[in-house]
């Protein structure tokens, strides 16, 4: 593996040259270089011009076409989508059709695959640069390799980066300068389009705290109104787009706050939601274009007499029916994957069931992970696993008639090979923790929703009201078939979160006798598959909502939106 990494670094030398020459970030905003992009015989004020703003988000390093889940006619159906080669073709076609095109990515571009892990994200840099994005913002997972690596990776991308709520942590609670510029201005067709950006301020809670060490996050409301005022009244922007990685619930909440007055659209990310029709809120419209490169959000703004007179939004599917693979992008990807191809494609087991992670409550991917950990740690009462959203489905069967699980797909499911940790907690602690976790997902107040789906568990059965009263959602809990005893001490396991205190396990505070095992998640799952393949990870209905279907696909409610 060391040789493979050396070969890769030699292959990617051009990236290193760019990374080492990062300019210090100024506090001033960025403005586009092509000050007045105009078509021939168009002075930007006569006639009508259509701006074509294209958005990807949460691609999670999914380089190749993959199986994707769609909800159609009341059931899950699957088809092939995504991959940077088809995305490259799509973007080239869009730019050719409309030179007023502007391409953005709203985060989570360096976490989610084995190639990214093996190269600390560096393999993605030349691929992203080849796609010629115009603007980036950091997602919640850009910190996966630490602050310094985040700065180097984003610094090596050949387009501006903006974010108005990530600051250098000077220590002792002292806030330094912004890490990235707060906004960007696109001068086009005689108008100014302002872009302002915010990422998730809850990163230190959602991810291992060590990942974001050296960074201070603030709530968007702290300076949003200020920067909107700057863009409108100082810079003279005709239209303001807020690029965010907050999650759809949080974005809807923000769009209903007075601080968002003056923002025309929120182009969001994080929760992998597929908004096909803009959600109209009090101050702004909100959209989010899915994940894994399966879709591109397309916002078209019609300009006349130096003003935006109308907007249209589309969610374009990236699939073989409308995009052929770009051979030059294919070759570029293969050149960086070559040192690792054999390991990535190595089959480590099989599943008789389609593998997916789209349902809010239980999924086959998480069931397989829990089954593996319960098999490895039979002495543990309850096995816990995070409610991750990332990882596309895998349903295509090979000659065996089963779904192959490769080493690369193991990294797609669990990019962080965390150590398995055990600890003890009382029944009372478990009950209180469950209430908090359920509120994170289903809170009536959208601003209180954060993180992924419902936390996953095995060895415990929980019946709850998803949309019940805060602190009173849990109706019953059983562990090993017996009612939860609030006084009894139970043994739990979960992944270690680097930087957590000794008495915290999977966000549960005050646990006792915590220790790391000799197993990592990957080791436990690999050994489980070696002994038990093919596996049949049918969800065990350990989590049952009385007021929601087991096929619930979104935590967003109270607005005109449906995941499909």
Each predicted region: which residue ranges?
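Acidic, metal/ion-coordinating pockets
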Residues: 3-320, 360, 364-372, 383, ...
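Catalytic centers of hydrolytic enzymes
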Residues: 43, 49-90, 96, 125, ...
